Amino acid sequence: MLRTTRRTLMQGASLVGAGLFAAGRGWALNRLEPIGDTLAEEYPYRDWEDLYRNEFTWDYVGKAAHCINCLGNCAFDIYVKDGIVIREEQLAKYPQISPDIPDANPRGCQKGAIHSTSMYEADRLRYPMKRVGARGEGKWQRISWDQATEEIADKIIDIYEKYGPGKLMTHTGSGNMSMMRMAAPYRFASLVGGVQLDIFTDVGDLNTGAHLAYGNALESFTSDAWFGADYIMFLLFNPVATRIPDAHFLWEAKWNGARVVSVAPDYNPSSIHSDLWMPIKQGADPFLAMSMVNVIIEGKLYNEAFMKEQTDLPILVRSDNGMLLREADLEEGGSDQVFYHWDSRTGAAVKVKGSMGSEEKTLVLGDVDPALEGSFEVGGIPVTTVFEKVRAEAAKYPPEETAAITGIGPGVVRAEAETFARAKKALLMTGFNIGRYSNGIYTSWALTLMLALTGHGGRTGGLDTSWIAWNQPALLELAFFDFKKLPRLEAGGLGEFVRGGMMEHSRQHYDNDKLKARTGFDLDELQEMIDESIDAGWMPYYGDMKGLISIADNKFRRNKNAEAYRERILEEVEELFVDINVRMDSTAQWADYLLPAAAHYEAWDLRSIAFHRFVNVFSRPVPPIGEAKSDWEIMEILTRKIQERAIARGITGYEDGDVTRDFATIHDDYTMDGTLMTDHDVVSWLVENGPEFAGATLEEGVERGFFVMGEDAGPTQKLRPSEPYHAFLQQTEGKEPYKTMTGRITFFVDHPRFVRLGATVPTARHHAGRDASNYPLNFFSPHTRWGIHSNWRSNKFMLRLQRGEPNIYISPQLAAAKGIADGAQVRVFNELSFFFAQAKFYPSLPPDTIMMEHGWEPHQFPNWRPMNVCMATLLQPLELVGGWGHLNFSLWHWNANQLAHESSVDIEPA
């Protein structure tokens, strides 16, 4: 029996007291007072339990959320005592928009609930620092803000003096997704003309197939719209792990009668709760989608009215050369963006309304009945329809033929396709991993075809891409300097691939012939197509840089071929490397200067996100730790120094194309002549000028903790106060054209590169994977539950909820064959490099695959060698095209993703 003596009790009490002080919680004992008249008042502490009771008292409560690249955006109450955040709690006061729909509460997850511990951890940056050793050596000197910004300002001016504009990268990563934190560095980049990569594609987050079909990848559904669906399918999406605050809508939909299907290579946390798990082979998703298209078309389960009005399926294609029939083919001086239907009623070709070249911007067909099938002749030119082309391609993928590729039986595919086609409201949901596969564009394009064939759009469902770009013009005007001057906007995946020298490592890893057989192109062809895209001006790439200001971007962790990439970038930015960051991450370790940024609870800010209509307020519950400053104030100080030094050196500005980079007035321009000096100034200005706030005041938002966005927040339609937001209602109900070349959902692209790669219509292609190289195991890295990218990955509480160190997931069968025990250290390797990790048994994973959740910092691995050292990568050449209707470079809409799941490895005991 356990016995407690006075001695052990006193020893334990001593340890508890020491622990409180060591944890910065000494204030819990500061309330002890001398005993006075014991009859007049109670003792301050009647018993030992009062120590714990007073631990949970506070001075005041502030408001905040967490503004890194997380789609939760959850309002929290922040409890402060003696100037220290002692804990946070979910606010859970969001209003219910309709009695028929569950509310959004409580919103939150384990990452947000421990941020008050993370902000005080040892990796937190507190003071400006200057490197005094070699890069990466870890030798730093604490300096003042004045010294840091003056030296940085002079080095920026030196770069412009020596090389002219265009050699300074001022890249803001996905760690800054709130309004103030985003506007500050983007406005700075706009003024200096810095290079800013697309933050979707540099990490592989862009759903290019959605843009290809709809002309807009950032039009989707709020999560409360999921509740009304009667059919939901997840692909490359694990919402229980990665959409924690919103997942309840999915299971409430299930309880409300919806069928929920999980398509995943592993029996993941979302598969567990689904009605059906379809255990697809990794990377085979486009083959599954095309086999379902096959069933829908062959069974005539399609909705002809929707197809005729909303899609390009009835548009005419020339049979002689395989190109769309254009007005320019039939009329001298005709447009190449006006197209034709075949009107079944009149037996003649009729010009399509709503295209980019049409003067009639409507989808209304009127008396025209477009033919979906058949062959015709127009002006002596033989033609057929897009639908005929699509049907011929889909015929190649019956479920019986694709079963060996997907691992899913034909009976299951047929039954599921029929159930999907009959659904009243169907949602196909993809996560951000779809952009990290070379065949992700094929997957998404085929999914949009499934939806269009069956009439699922607007209120009847559609493709959920996890993102809505709300109408927030004031934010964009602030960030992009009223669009008078812009940063050098660069294609994200392309920029990282070329600048990081990744082709060299791809050539080491892939077998060219095998790669061609898998993807439709080899590395020589890929290089040729990359060069063509840059030389033709389709995709902007600005070449080597001389300086880098990195803001909230852990680029040395996230990029593939990690160590070689880091060496290449450090060699390039020889003049200057500044890292503006909250913590000492794997990128900050290599900088010349470190500027400490305020954390989530230390600055005024606003945050909106796609899945809900609420803008959360950050009321700066505590001042920044040490000498950290808000992002706005950092750029205010830096522009002030640039202006001072430019004037002192007799420099006014630099001609840069059509604009002048006015260094002698850059601080005045940045602050609107002194109007916006602080983060609070910025937040006040945004609320006053943003139509999404519908006239509400900042004080009202602070009191509540959030704003409810008004009708004007809707990007393509009104955000109705009592209805969820559904994608493309303006098209399905308002009959406005889509932002595509034909004005319709697009399933035929006759761009020369699409023709070259045999992809003029939706089809299926393999990703590279193990069969494109010489290593036996597929290797993929989904998002983790225990962090947002690398944020919180090293937090002690998050580590306690898992193995506590980097681990790979391995099937017991593979482990047995390799002589690996659960929990053992393993060596993962290929010809590029190797890393060590712990093995964790995962029975649902196929024996030809290992999985590792992303986001681990290099310093958490033995020898600081991370998983990315073994990752070769590619670009998808279709995503690099331009000069075709809506397929032109567009920030956050159309350019090539950095890919993550294309390489292979082997494994052995360490």
Curated annotation (Swiss-Prot):
GO terms for molecular function: 4 iron, 4 sulfur cluster binding; metal ion binding; molybdopterin cofactor binding; oxidoreductase activity. The keyword ATP-binding does not apply. Keywords: 4Fe-4S, Iron, Iron-sulfur, Metal-binding, Molybdenum, Oxidoreductase, Periplasm, Signal. It is found in: Periplasm. Residues 59-123 form the 4Fe-4S Mo/W bis-MGD-type domain. Its main location: periplasm. It catalyses: 2 Fe(III)-[cytochrome c2] + dimethyl sulfide + H2O = 2 Fe(II)-[cytochrome c2] + dimethyl sulfoxide + 2 H(+). Residues 1-28 form the signal peptide. InterPro entries: Asp_de-COase-like_dom_sf, DMSO_Rdtase_II_Mopterin_su, MopB_CT_Nitrate-R-NarG-like, MoPterin_dinucl-bd_dom, Mopterin_OxRdtase, Mopterin_OxRdtase_4Fe-4S_dom, Mopterin_OxRdtase_prok_CS, Prok_Mopterin_Oxidored. PANTHER family: OXIDOREDUCTASE YYAE-RELATED (PTHR43742:SF6), TRIMETHYLAMINE-N-OXIDE REDUCTASE (PTHR43742). Heterotrimer of alpha, beta and gamma subunits. This is Dimethylsulfide dehydrogenase subunit alpha. It comes from Rhodovulum sulfidophilum (Rhodobacter sulfidophilus).
